[in-house]
Design a protein with these regions (language model features):
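Polyanion/phosphate-binding surface patch
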Residues: 1-22, 60-61, 66-74
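Short, conserved charged micro-motifs
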Residues: 27-29, 76-80
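Phosphate/anion-contacting hairpin/loop surfaces
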Residues: 28-62, 66
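Residue-level "edge-of-site" marker
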Residues: 45, 94, 117
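Short secondary-structure boundary/hinge segments and terminal tails
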Residues: 50-51, 99-100, 122
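Mixed-charge, glycine-accented linear interaction segment located at domain edges/termini
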Residues: 78-114
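Cationic, histidine-enriched alpha-helical/coil surfaces that engage anionic ligands
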Residues: 109-125
Length: 125
């Protein structure tokens, strides 16, 4: 489970993150429910992770496209991006929800969530 704070202004998506493993997701769902919380967006992705000095490189396959996420120091990210033939002008700072909403609007998809079985066919989830 990950808490993600607000994005700081700048050419890269920088924000506080707190992460922990959840041994029983169903218990967490029940706790959230008892606290009055409801799921408002779900998404699926397949992730492969690689490492470069000081940078974690994640290759994310989602229902709306495949993306590379770089996590690490600014210098490390710029070095890896350059090695991949990319510059800060190529960086996507939007969230997966934002990417999904743009995809859904452009492709007349009515699904509420970014799931592999619903994004392509436009059905609701």
């Amino acid at each position: 489970m990950t808490f993600k704070g607000p994005v700081q202004p700048g050419p890269m998506k920088v924000r506080e993150e707190q992460e922990t493993e959840v041994s029983d997701p169903e218990v967490v769902r029940r706790v959230f429910h008892e606290l009055g919380m409801q799921a408002w967006f779900r998404y699926q992705k397949f992730r492969e992770e690689y490492e470069a000095p000081g940078v974690v490189i994640a290759l994310d396959e989602t229902p709306v496209g495949t993306y590379v996420e770089l996590e690490g120091s600014e210098e490390g990210i710029l070095t890896v991006a350059d090695a991949l033939g990319r510059s800060p002008a190529d960086f996507i700072l939007d969230s997966y929800r934002g990417l999904f909403l743009a995809f859904a609007q452009a492709n007349n998809v009515s699904a509420r969530d970014m799931l592999f079985d619903t994004a392509a066919d436009g059905t609701g989830a």
